[in-house]
Amino acid sequence: MAQIALCCTSHSPLLNLPGPSRELLDDIGSALAVARDFVTEFDPDLVVTFSPDHYNGFFYKVMPPFCVGTSAQGVGDYGTHAGPLDVPEDLANELATAVLEAGVDVAISASMDVDHGTVQPLQNLFGDAMARPVIPVFINSVATPLGPLRRTRALGTAIGRYLATLDKRVLVIGSGGLSHDPPVPTLATAPPAALDRIVHGAPMSTEQRMARQSAVIDAAHAFAHGESPLQPLNPAWDATFLEILDEGWLSDLDGWSNAFIAREGGNSAHEIRTWVAAFAALAAGGDYRTGLRFYRAAPELIAGFAIRTAVLA
């Protein structure tokens, strides 16, 4: 019989870049250490990650709402793991088949490129992205139009029911959020070079990657000093979302429209979908209880930064 545990965490490229204060990094680092101890004690045989992408692996040329990687590699953005992940191909295919049979349309990728949204939590929790077998599940959280949140919950439930059939200890990870509205190109606003990137996946040169990294650092500095047009963080909205998860009221989220999420949390707050899927996967096994409950509004990261751990009650 499977044992399922959960760890959801925000991610940020700025954790690996100059700018954030030592106090902030220490505060988040202390919480991550608690999460790491939780994961170490659970000692999973398999990890399933729910994560977004930031136009590093998925592009408007073909943009699935959901995709299961049967083989995957990190692109190495922002100093994260570059190279293959240990993806159990047979299990990943079984998972995708089970999800489809449950009535949730999901694509597969036999060569999924994953970025810091997938890899950073693995490195933070295990020290090495290759430390455990992992099945990466992509959830589109950036490229509009987006599906309703209830379909993300259905995805998580279907995956959770499949995982319950395995004789393994499985850790589900949700990566992203919470409220944040970083500068991300869109079809309507992207200049030609960026448009080619987000539509066709035009490769970025080293110089272009460094320029993007510098732009992210500058945007965070301006945001932290109140000199940015970006949408402010919304700690109250973040708290409401976290309370819903902590109390197990997942069906309440079915009423959250995409417009509401963007208005309250920012355009990239749609990354909460990864948390919804992860908690739904856990809840497929019954009632659960959360353990670590960390939250900090972090303008230096342009994010409401949260971490949760949970096990079945």
From Swiss-Prot:
Coiled coil: none annotated. It catalyses: 3-(2,3-dihydroxyphenyl)propanoate + O2 = (2Z,4E)-2-hydroxy-6-oxonona-2,4-dienedioate + H(+); (2E)-3-(2,3-dihydroxyphenyl)prop-2-enoate + O2 = (2Z,4E,7E)-2-hydroxy-6-oxonona-2,4,7-trienedioate + H(+). The active site is at H116 (proton donor), H180 (proton acceptor). InterPro entries: DHPP/DHXA_dioxygenase (IPR023789), Xdiol_dOase_suB (IPR004183). Its cofactor is Fe(2+). Keywords: Aromatic hydrocarbons catabolism, Dioxygenase, Iron, Oxidoreductase. GO terms for molecular function: 3-carboxyethylcatechol 2,3-dioxygenase activity; ferrous iron binding. The keyword Oxidoreductase applies. It comes from the Bacteria. GO terms for biological process: 3-phenylpropionate catabolic process. NCBIfam families: PRK13370.1-4. HAMAP family: MhpB (MF_01653). Catalyzes the non-heme iron(II)-dependent oxidative cleavage of 2,3-dihydroxyphenylpropionic acid and 2,3-dihydroxicinnamic acid into 2-hydroxy-6-ketononadienedioate and 2-hydroxy-6-ketononatrienedioate, respectively. Belongs to the LigB/MhpB extradiol dioxygenase family. This is 2,3-dihydroxyphenylpropionate/2,3-dihydroxicinnamic acid 1,2-dioxygenase. The gene is mhpB.
